[in-house]
Amino acid sequence: MLCLLIKNNRKMSRIGNNPVTLPAGVTFEISENVITVKGKLGELSQEIKDGIVIKNEEGVISVERPSNSKDHKAKHGLYRALINNMIIGVNEGWSKELELVGVGYRASNQGQILDLALGFSHNIVIDVAPEVKIETISEKGRNPKIKLTSVDKQLVGAVAAKIRSFRKPEPYKGKGVKYVGEVLRRKAGKSA
Protein backbone atom coordinates (compact mmCIF):
# COMPACT_ATOMS: atom_id res chain seq x y z
CA MET A 1 0.00 0.00 0.00
CA LEU A 2 2.84 2.37 0.86
CA CYS A 3 4.51 1.76 -2.51
CA LEU A 4 1.30 2.70 -4.34
CA LEU A 5 1.04 5.99 -2.47
CA ILE A 6 4.63 6.93 -3.26
CA LYS A 7 4.25 5.96 -6.90
CA ASN A 8 1.06 8.02 -7.33
CA ASN A 9 2.64 11.02 -5.56
CA ARG A 10 5.24 11.50 -8.36
CA LYS A 11 2.82 13.12 -10.81
CA MET A 12 4.13 16.62 -10.20
CA SER A 13 7.64 17.76 -11.04
CA ARG A 14 9.43 18.55 -7.81
CA ILE A 15 11.95 20.88 -9.46
CA GLY A 16 9.94 22.29 -12.37
CA ASN A 17 7.09 23.63 -10.24
CA ASN A 18 9.35 25.73 -8.01
CA PRO A 19 9.45 29.35 -9.22
CA VAL A 20 12.77 31.16 -9.65
CA THR A 21 13.08 34.68 -8.22
CA LEU A 22 15.28 37.22 -9.99
CA PRO A 23 17.84 38.92 -7.73
CA ALA A 24 18.44 42.67 -8.00
CA GLY A 25 20.62 43.64 -10.96
CA VAL A 26 19.68 40.63 -13.11
CA THR A 27 17.51 41.04 -16.23
CA PHE A 28 15.58 38.22 -17.91
CA GLU A 29 14.35 38.42 -21.52
CA ILE A 30 12.29 35.96 -23.58
CA SER A 31 12.26 36.29 -27.38
CA GLU A 32 10.85 33.54 -29.61
CA ASN A 33 12.54 30.33 -28.37
CA VAL A 34 15.57 31.97 -26.73
CA ILE A 35 15.91 33.23 -23.18
CA THR A 36 18.66 35.68 -22.24
CA VAL A 37 19.87 36.43 -18.72
CA LYS A 38 22.13 39.45 -18.07
CA GLY A 39 23.88 40.31 -14.82
CA LYS A 40 26.94 42.00 -13.36
CA LEU A 41 29.27 39.14 -14.41
CA GLY A 42 28.04 38.63 -17.97
CA GLU A 43 25.29 37.33 -20.22
CA LEU A 44 23.99 33.82 -21.01
CA SER A 45 21.47 32.55 -23.58
CA GLN A 46 19.55 29.27 -23.81
CA GLU A 47 17.30 27.91 -26.55
CA ILE A 48 13.97 26.47 -25.36
CA LYS A 49 12.36 23.62 -27.34
CA ASP A 50 9.31 21.35 -27.21
CA GLY A 51 6.64 23.91 -26.33
CA ILE A 52 7.76 24.53 -22.74
CA VAL A 53 6.19 27.84 -21.60
CA ILE A 54 8.26 30.29 -19.55
CA LYS A 55 6.62 33.27 -17.84
CA ASN A 56 8.24 36.26 -16.14
CA GLU A 57 5.78 37.86 -13.73
CA GLU A 58 7.28 40.72 -11.70
CA GLY A 59 10.66 39.11 -11.11
CA VAL A 60 9.30 35.59 -10.53
CA ILE A 61 9.98 33.12 -13.34
CA SER A 62 7.78 30.06 -13.71
CA VAL A 63 8.12 27.14 -16.12
CA GLU A 64 5.04 25.28 -17.39
CA ARG A 65 4.63 22.22 -19.58
CA PRO A 66 1.88 21.76 -22.20
CA SER A 67 1.09 18.12 -21.33
CA ASN A 68 1.95 15.34 -18.90
CA SER A 69 3.90 13.28 -21.43
CA LYS A 70 7.13 11.71 -20.23
CA ASP A 71 9.23 13.98 -22.46
CA HIS A 72 7.50 17.19 -21.31
CA LYS A 73 7.86 16.18 -17.65
CA ALA A 74 11.60 15.66 -18.12
CA LYS A 75 12.11 18.96 -19.99
CA HIS A 76 10.00 20.82 -17.39
CA GLY A 77 12.52 20.25 -14.59
CA LEU A 78 15.50 20.54 -16.94
CA TYR A 79 14.68 24.04 -18.18
CA ARG A 80 13.83 25.27 -14.68
CA ALA A 81 17.24 24.05 -13.46
CA LEU A 82 19.04 25.59 -16.46
CA ILE A 83 17.36 28.97 -15.86
CA ASN A 84 18.26 28.85 -12.16
CA ASN A 85 21.90 28.01 -13.00
CA MET A 86 22.04 30.87 -15.52
CA ILE A 87 20.71 33.38 -12.97
CA ILE A 88 23.19 32.25 -10.29
CA GLY A 89 26.01 32.31 -12.87
CA VAL A 90 25.52 35.91 -14.04
CA ASN A 91 24.99 37.11 -10.46
CA GLU A 92 27.58 35.15 -8.41
CA GLY A 93 29.47 32.93 -10.89
CA TRP A 94 30.41 29.24 -10.71
CA SER A 95 33.75 27.75 -9.70
CA LYS A 96 35.42 24.35 -9.46
CA GLU A 97 38.70 23.56 -7.77
CA LEU A 98 40.97 20.66 -8.72
CA GLU A 99 43.87 19.27 -6.69
CA LEU A 100 46.91 17.51 -8.18
CA VAL A 101 48.01 14.67 -5.86
CA GLY A 102 51.31 13.03 -6.75
CA VAL A 103 55.08 13.52 -6.66
CA GLY A 104 56.18 16.00 -9.31
CA TYR A 105 52.65 16.93 -10.39
CA ARG A 106 52.56 20.62 -11.33
CA ALA A 107 50.21 23.10 -12.99
CA SER A 108 50.91 26.52 -14.48
CA ASN A 109 49.03 28.82 -16.80
CA GLN A 110 49.83 31.65 -19.18
CA GLY A 111 46.54 33.33 -19.98
CA GLN A 112 44.15 30.65 -21.26
CA ILE A 113 46.85 28.01 -21.82
CA LEU A 114 47.13 25.48 -18.99
CA ASP A 115 50.34 23.42 -18.70
CA LEU A 116 50.08 20.21 -16.63
CA ALA A 117 52.90 17.91 -15.52
CA LEU A 118 51.14 14.69 -14.47
CA GLY A 119 53.91 12.11 -14.51
CA PHE A 120 53.86 11.41 -18.24
CA SER A 121 56.97 11.73 -20.43
CA HIS A 122 55.56 15.01 -21.78
CA ASN A 123 53.54 17.89 -20.35
CA ILE A 124 49.86 18.21 -21.24
CA VAL A 125 48.98 21.61 -22.71
CA ILE A 126 45.30 22.62 -22.82
CA ASP A 127 43.84 25.69 -24.50
CA VAL A 128 40.87 26.59 -22.27
CA ALA A 129 37.82 28.51 -23.55
CA PRO A 130 38.07 32.30 -23.01
CA GLU A 131 34.87 32.31 -20.91
CA VAL A 132 36.63 30.31 -18.16
CA LYS A 133 39.11 32.09 -15.86
CA ILE A 134 42.02 29.89 -14.74
CA GLU A 135 44.03 30.33 -11.56
CA THR A 136 46.81 27.96 -10.51
CA ILE A 137 47.85 27.86 -6.85
CA SER A 138 51.22 26.36 -5.89
CA GLU A 139 52.25 26.57 -2.23
CA LYS A 140 55.35 24.92 -0.83
CA GLY A 141 54.54 21.69 1.00
CA ARG A 142 51.00 21.47 -0.43
CA ASN A 143 49.46 19.89 -3.50
CA PRO A 144 49.06 22.24 -6.50
CA LYS A 145 45.50 23.42 -7.17
CA ILE A 146 43.65 24.69 -10.23
CA LYS A 147 40.67 27.02 -9.76
CA LEU A 148 38.24 27.47 -12.67
CA THR A 149 35.57 30.22 -12.61
CA SER A 150 32.93 31.27 -15.14
CA VAL A 151 29.31 32.37 -15.47
CA ASP A 152 28.45 29.13 -17.33
CA LYS A 153 28.09 26.15 -14.95
CA GLN A 154 28.10 23.60 -17.78
CA LEU A 155 31.32 24.97 -19.27
CA VAL A 156 33.15 25.01 -15.91
CA GLY A 157 32.08 21.42 -15.25
CA ALA A 158 33.12 20.26 -18.72
CA VAL A 159 36.59 21.86 -18.49
CA ALA A 160 37.13 20.47 -14.96
CA ALA A 161 36.05 16.98 -16.09
CA LYS A 162 38.42 17.14 -19.08
CA ILE A 163 41.38 18.13 -16.85
CA ARG A 164 40.49 15.36 -14.36
CA SER A 165 40.25 12.78 -17.18
CA PHE A 166 43.97 13.11 -18.00
CA ARG A 167 44.91 11.38 -14.72
CA LYS A 168 41.94 10.17 -12.68
CA PRO A 169 42.69 9.36 -9.02
CA GLU A 170 43.69 5.74 -8.58
CA PRO A 171 42.19 3.81 -5.63
CA TYR A 172 45.41 2.49 -4.03
CA LYS A 173 47.48 5.61 -3.28
CA GLY A 174 45.00 8.29 -4.36
CA LYS A 175 47.39 9.80 -6.91
CA GLY A 176 45.88 11.81 -9.74
CA VAL A 177 43.73 14.88 -10.40
CA LYS A 178 40.74 15.13 -8.06
CA TYR A 179 38.12 17.70 -7.15
CA VAL A 180 38.78 19.52 -3.86
CA GLY A 181 36.64 17.82 -1.24
CA GLU A 182 36.10 14.68 -3.36
CA VAL A 183 36.02 11.51 -1.27
CA LEU A 184 37.85 8.67 -3.01
CA ARG A 185 37.01 5.01 -2.58
CA ARG A 186 40.30 3.50 -1.43
CA LYS A 187 41.39 -0.13 -1.78
CA ALA A 188 43.83 -2.12 0.31
CA GLY A 189 46.96 -3.30 -1.47
CA LYS A 190 48.18 -6.89 -1.69
CA SER A 191 48.86 -8.38 1.73
CA ALA A 192 52.14 -10.29 1.96
Regions inferred by a protein language model and the residue ranges of each:
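Short, Lys/Arg-enriched N-terminal segments with co-localized hydrophobic residues
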Residues: 1-11
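N-terminal intrinsically disordered, cationic/polar leader segments
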Residues: 11-88, 92-161, 165-192
